[in-house]
Amino acid sequence: AMEGPTPVSALIHAATMVTAGLYLIAKLSFLFILAPFTLTIIAALGTVTALLGATVALTQTDIKKVLAYSTVSQLGYMFLAMGVGAFGAGIFHVLTHAFFKALLFLGAGAVIHALHHEQDMRRMGGLRQRLPWTYATMLIGTLAISGIPLFSGFFSKDEILWSAYSSPFGSPVLWLFGFLTAGLTSFYMFRMIYLTFHGAFQGAHAESIHEPPMSMVLPLIVLAVLAVFGGF
């Protein structure tokens, strides 16, 4: 997914290819409910995966790698939901995650296209005036994945965290690590937005930067609408 074009990355990270195991657990939930210890292992592994993916994303400078490790973290969130018996919440997060993660990858592709294949965020900056549609839609995706209220990610993440705390299979410890991961997610995503779109431009060929054609912008707008309303 990392080496392919961003539309391929968007499809792979947003579609069921990376969530096949999650879907399997959901379909066999009637069996997993009978094995509480197995659910505990799933919840623990999901929590560790979510936290580890988020901490690695904090250190990345490649815009696509930030989103790739973000997917790892969000998959951990989904498995946390499965492990505490919140199978519906886990599948709900698959849906909302598909909207905002596809949006973010396609937005990253628009940025890379505008900068002549540059992916290092340290060589970006100040792009919000030159790429206003890309900036606005990626900001919406960032608000959604960060779990800001009324965006789609808020509803699914809130359900997962509540289940981690209140479910018979959950615990305050799982909730705490899930909450910490949510904070880290917000931090590294807004870090990406700041390095890419704010401050001064750090790259070359500033005069040639322009908004991608409408054929690239329109999917961003559609996905941005879904990232806002997909949780209702």
Please provide the spans of the model-predicted regions.
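Hydrophobic transmembrane alpha-helices and their helix-loop junctions in integral membrane proteins
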Residues: A1-S215, L226-F232
